[in-house]
């Protein structure tokens, strides 16, 4: 009898913990973690469909746009990185060789498109 009442008490405690967690999850506002346009590419479309955090289903279905606070990054904050300059790269490598005598450089062979070639 004691075992049965302990088992029932354990089940009730587990169910109430799940219920509390579910109620708290409903109170978290749904936010878009990644703001991408689905038409940009198929990969972006997958992310746009998938990355929604409401914590009832974590990675759940996309909610209506009326529910979501969409954050747009202004163009002024986006900084484009210039391509690497060979002189700057050579200076960096020489500096590293000076600081670390055992520094070694590894050069991967590439094709004209700039892709790394593993097998030639």
From Swiss-Prot:
Protein purpose: Secreted effector required for virulence. Functions as an inhibitor of a set of apoplastic maize papain-like cysteine proteases (PLCPs) including CP1A, CP1B, XCP2 and CP2, whose activity is directly linked with salicylic-acid-associated plant defenses. Acts as a substrate mimicking molecule for apoplastic PLCPs and its processing releases the embedded inhibitor peptide PID14, which in turn blocks PLCPs to modulate host immunity.
Domain of life: Eukaryota
Protein name, entry field: Secreted effector PIT2
Subunit relationships: Interacts with host cysteine proteases CP1A, CP1B, XCP2 and CP2.
Keywords: Secreted, Signal
Deletion phenotype: Keeps the ability to penetrate maize epidermis and to grow intracellularly at sites of infection but fails to spread and induce tumors in infected leaves.
Region span, PID14 protease inhibitor domain: 46-59
GO CC annotations on file: extracellular region
Signal peptide: 1-25
Compartments, as annotated in UniProt: Secreted
Description of what induces expression: Expression is highly up-regulated during all stages of pathogenic development. Expression is positively regulated by the unfolded protein response (UPR) signaling via the binding of CIB1 to the UPRE motif localized at the PIT1/PIT2 promoter.
Swiss-Prot/TrEMBL domain comment: The PID14 protease inhibitor domain is sufficient for inhibition of host cysteine proteases.
Organism: Mycosarcoma maydis
Free-text description of this protein's post-translational modifications in UniProt: Cleaved by host target papain-like cysteine proteases (PLCPs) to release the embedded inhibitor peptide PID14.
